[in-house]
Amino acid sequence: DTCCSIEDRREVQALWRSIWSAEDTGRRTLIGRLLFEELFEIDGATKGLFKRVNVDDTHSPEEFAHVLRVVNGLDTLIGVLGDSDTLNSLIDHLAEQHKARAGFKTVYFKEFGKALNHVLPEVASCFNPEAWNHCFDGLVDVISHRIDG
């Protein structure tokens, strides 16, 4: 959290609002699918974590719901970057969820961050990787520490 300055938070939140607050669920789903496709390109082993949500069929209702759950979770985290109590509560919840997933490794959060760095510049005109990485990497460090103990 200390590396994610107030300016970084504002920039990340403004960028995210510009791509995510649209009422178009189709766009949200497309962005989410692009993120997961990129993640699977970065590390094919991650795909095995999502078999229960029918990830091989990118148009299945299970995969659709999962993509929205994950990216809506990210949306919630971004929305509360300036609210430490709520953010910490959400991070605790996410840490417990991911701890319970067989085969999950905290390095996958970093790989998801790489996917974000590839996809977000394609869907947002004002992507600032420095601000984004300050905030996202800070979240990853905290949640990873809580998972790994």
Swiss-Prot record:
Family stated for the protein in its record: Belongs to the globin family.
Secretion signal span: none
Protein name, as recorded: Extracellular globin-2C
Residues annotated as domain Globin: 3-148
Subunit structure: Giant hemoglobins of worms are formed of a monomeric subunit and a disulfide-bonded trimer. IIC is part of the disulfide bonded trimer composed of IIA, IIB and IIC.
SUPFAM superfamilies: Globin-like
S-S bonds: 4-126
Matching InterPro entries: Globin (IPR000971), Globin-like_sf (IPR009050), Globin/Proto (IPR012292), Haemoglobin_extracell (IPR014610), Mb-like_M (IPR044399)
Chain ranges passing through the membrane: none
GO CC term, one of those recorded: hemoglobin complex
Binding of heme b, residues: 98
Keywords carried by this UniProt record: Disulfide bond, Heme, Iron, Metal-binding, Oxygen transport, Secreted, Transport
Protein location: Secreted
Source species taxonomy: Eukaryota, Metazoa, Spiralia, Lophotrochozoa, Annelida
An example Gene Ontology molecular-function term: oxygen binding
Primary residence: secreted
